[in-house]
Amino acid sequence: MSKIIIATANKGKAKEFEKIFAKFNIEVATLADFPEIGEIEETGTTFAENAALKAETVASVLNQTVIADDSGLIVDALDGAPGVYSARYAGVAHDDAKNNEKLLKNLEGVEPDKRTARFHCTLAVATPSEKTSFYTGEVEGVIAEQLCGTNGFGYDPLFFLPEFGLTMAEIPAEKKNEISHRANAIKQLEKDLVEVVEKVTKK
């Protein structure tokens, strides 16, 4: 069976990709399967740079096609912050609670109609000796004034979806997987999936 590498150790992300490649009889492997690679430092200043950094680094080491993603929250009232620093907004510890606390503090006094935001995801598909391809997806919302919901992770409890009247942490996981920024980026990737599959199967 052919195998595609997803440059992540996140099991949730891996499952999303597994669903796509299963119909092509392609197995999904993650960085958890290659502990010798270790953590790749995200030194880019854009989502595309970080996604490419991860995908190209792993593709070079393993000499095969690799998919990586970089995603985050963009808040208009904060000039795009936390952006590429979303996971470490309150420090390097990737602490969801502290990140949410800092976000709420920085938005104190901001009117509801000025709290517009979006989740963004960029996927990078890297193959050795070939140009890296990029696919993006977003979902629009508003930052709530308090945490609501227990599903999801990260900023989900604060990301309010007006069309549903719920935060991302309140909607069912199945619905989130349909409308999320990552889901929308994957939909773009699916348009070129046959080409990606060919790169994997010819190895």
Curated annotation (Swiss-Prot):
GO terms assigned for molecular function: dITP diphosphatase activity; ITP diphosphatase activity; metal ion binding; nucleoside triphosphate diphosphatase activity; nucleotide binding; ribonucleoside triphosphate phosphatase activity; XTP diphosphatase activity
Keywords annotated in UniProt: Hydrolase, Magnesium, Metal-binding, Nucleotide metabolism, Nucleotide-binding
Protein name in the entry: dITP/XTP pyrophosphatase
Catalytic activity: XTP + H2O = XMP + diphosphate + H(+); dITP + H2O = dIMP + diphosphate + H(+); ITP + H2O = IMP + diphosphate + H(+)
UniProt keyword annotation of Methyltransferase present: no
Species lineage: Bacteria, Bacillati, Bacillota, Bacilli, Bacillales
Purpose: Pyrophosphatase that catalyzes the hydrolysis of nucleoside triphosphates to their monophosphate derivatives, with a high preference for the non-canonical purine nucleotides XTP (xanthosine triphosphate), dITP (deoxyinosine triphosphate) and ITP. Seems to function as a house-cleaning enzyme that removes non-canonical purine nucleotides from the nucleotide pool, thus preventing their incorporation into DNA/RNA and avoiding chromosomal lesions.
Signal peptide boundaries: none
Cofactor: Mg(2+)
